[in-house]
Amino acid sequence: RALGPLIPSRLFDQFFGEGLLEYDLLPWFSSTISPYYRQSLFRSVLESGISEVRSDREKFTIMLDVKHFSPEDLSVKIIDDFVEIHGKHSERQDDHGYISREFHRRYRLPANVDQAAITCSLSNDGMLTFSGPKVPANMDASHGERPIP
C-alpha cells in the first residue's frame, strides 16, 4: 500500500543516476524520516528507479527500472545464491550537461528457486524482469555460477 511521499511504497525505491536538484541541497527540504530516503517533490514514483522483489509459491521475481541503460550496459549474473545486476555507461551528454551512471544490485535467491530455469528480459520502457520458478521441497534446485543472457 502506498502511504504517500513520506513513506516509500517499495523497499528498494531509489533515485540512482538522476542527479541533484537545487532543493536537494537545502536542509529544510531534506527528509526527516531517514538520511537514506530521498523525498522527491517533483518526480512521480514511477520515475524513481524502482526495484521490486516478489516471491510467491510458484516463482521469485525481481523487477528493476534500468531505463537509463542500454542492454549492452547491463550485466546479470547468478553467483551461488545471489543475483548480481550491474549497470554502467560512460559519460554522455543529456539536457543538463554530461553524466555517467553506474549501479550494482545484489539479491539473495530463495533456496528453492530452480536456477537452471531462470529467465531475464528487458522491456522497451526499460524495465528489467528477472524471474525463476520455485521447485517443490522434495526436489533439488540447481546452484552454481552462470551469466544470464
Curated annotation (Swiss-Prot):
Belongs to the small heat shock protein (HSP20) family. Its main location: cytoplasm. Contributes to the transparency and refractive index of the lens. May act as a chaperone, preventing aggregation of various proteins under a wide range of stress conditions. GO terms for biological process: lens development in camera-type eye; negative regulation of apoptotic process; protein refolding; response to heat. GO terms for molecular function: metal ion binding; structural constituent of eye lens; unfolded protein binding. GO terms for cellular component: cytoplasm; nucleus. This is Alpha-crystallin A chain. Residues 41-149 form the sHSP domain. Pfam families: Crystallin (PF00525), HSP20 (PF00011). It is found in: Cytoplasm; Nucleus. Zn(2+) 3 binds at residue 143. PANTHER family: ALPHA-CRYSTALLIN A CHAIN, HEAT SHOCK PROTEIN HSP-12.2-RELATED. The keyword Nucleus applies. Zn(2+) 1 binds at residues 89, 91. Zn(2+) 2 binds at residue 96. It comes from Columba livia.
